[in-house]
Amino acid sequence: MGLLSRLRKREPISIYDKIGGHEAIEVVVEDFYVRVLADDQLSAFFSGTNMSRLKGKQVEFFAAALGGPEPYTGAPMKQVHQGRGITMHHFSLVAGHLADALTAAGVPSETITEILGVIAPLAVDVTSGESTTAPV
């Protein structure tokens, strides 16, 4: 196979690589949780949570979801979130904090839109509509 043929068949760059890989995701996840935990409508969901472990799993999840080399090894989203009273309103708030953290990290708006498009289908597994406010 000639050089031109190989160049034409290059794999498209993953979102994971576009945003800077594992290190960039770690920075975004750290900022993301600062924002989420500062949100009075969301912070109570994380009461008693081992945040260090959660951040590690979140980095792993985002890396896998965005085309990184390693698979996500955590529990299924539905299992982790069921019965917690997370509504679409909460999901939208979380998505907004993610977009803000990505923007702060210098991720271009079109890439942020791609990322939110990857995350949006998870709403079905994460939300239950059982409550309109976080537990107190």
Swiss-Prot record:
One of its GO terms (biological process) is nitric oxide catabolic process. Keywords: Heme, Iron, Metal-binding, Oxygen transport, Transport. One of its GO terms (molecular function) is thioredoxin peroxidase activity. Heme binds at residue 81. SUPFAM superfamilies: Globin-like (SSF46458). GO terms for cellular component: cytoplasm; cytosol. Belongs to the truncated hemoglobin family. Group I subfamily. Was identified as a high-confidence drug target. Binds oxygen cooperatively with very high affinity (P(50) = 0.013 mmHg at 20 degrees Celsius) because of a fast combination (25 microM(-1)sec(-1)) and a slow dissociation (0.2 sec(-1)) rate. Homodimer. This is Group 1 truncated hemoglobin GlbN. It comes from Mycobacterium tuberculosis (strain ATCC 25618 / H37Rv).
